[in-house]
């Protein structure tokens, strides 16, 4: 039981740090960002809305992308990696931002 509490605390800290870092990364000229109740909504005109949310019961972050669809990121050594391909969440968003740039013509 104590291990589960420690794991949950570690997850909550890592999730908070990751959401804070994502909020900074997404604060750019492409869209508008809202961060409320541990959910980030990032809306890009002409592309759609991203949603990033904590899922404490399974210790994951879930992402909904208007470009690539849904993804689940599990915690590995205090970082979140995509469950299907192992990509770290910050790298995932770097790639998404590149796709947005191409879609919007580098505006």
UniProtKB/Swiss-Prot annotation:
Compartments in which it is found: Cytoplasm
Q: What superkingdom does the record give? A: Eukaryota
| Molecular function per GO | 2 iron, 2 sulfur cluster binding; ferric iron binding; ferrous iron binding; ferroxidase activity; iron chaperone activity
Q: Which PROSITE patterns match?
A: FRATAXIN_1, FRATAXIN_2
Give the source species.
Trachipleistophora hominis
Alphabetical UniProt keywords: Cytoplasm, Ion transport, Iron, Iron transport, Transport
Q: What does the record give as the function of this protein?
A: Promotes the assembly and repair of iron-sulfur clusters by delivering Fe(2+) to proteins involved in these pathways.
Where is it chiefly localized?
Answer: cytoplasm
Q: What is this protein called?
A: Frataxin
Q: Partners and quaternary state?
A: Monomer.
**Organism placement in taxonomy:** Eukaryota, Fungi, Fungi incertae sedis, Microsporidia, Pleistophoridae
Family of this protein: Belongs to the frataxin family.
Q: Which GO terms describe its biological process?
A: intracellular iron ion homeostasis; iron ion transport; iron-sulfur cluster assembly
Q: GO CC annotations?
A: mitochondrion
Pfam families named in the record:
Frataxin_Cyay (PF01491)
**InterPro entries, sorted:** Frataxin/CyaY, Frataxin/CyaY_sf, Frataxin_CS
């Amino acid at each position: 039981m104590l291990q589960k509490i420690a794991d949950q605390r570690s997850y909550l800290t890592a999730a908070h740090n990751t959401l804070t870092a994502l909020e900074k990364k997404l604060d750019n000229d492409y869209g508008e960002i809202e961060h409320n109740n541990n959910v980030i909504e990032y809306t890009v005109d002409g592309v759609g809305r991203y949603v990033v949310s904590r899922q404490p019961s399974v210790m994951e972050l879930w992402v909904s992308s208007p470009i690539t669809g849904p993804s689940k990121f599990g915690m590995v050594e205090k970082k979140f990696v995509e469950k299907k391909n192992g990509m770290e969440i910050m790298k995932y968003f770097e790639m998404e931002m590149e796709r947005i740039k191409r879609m919007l013509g580098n505006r």
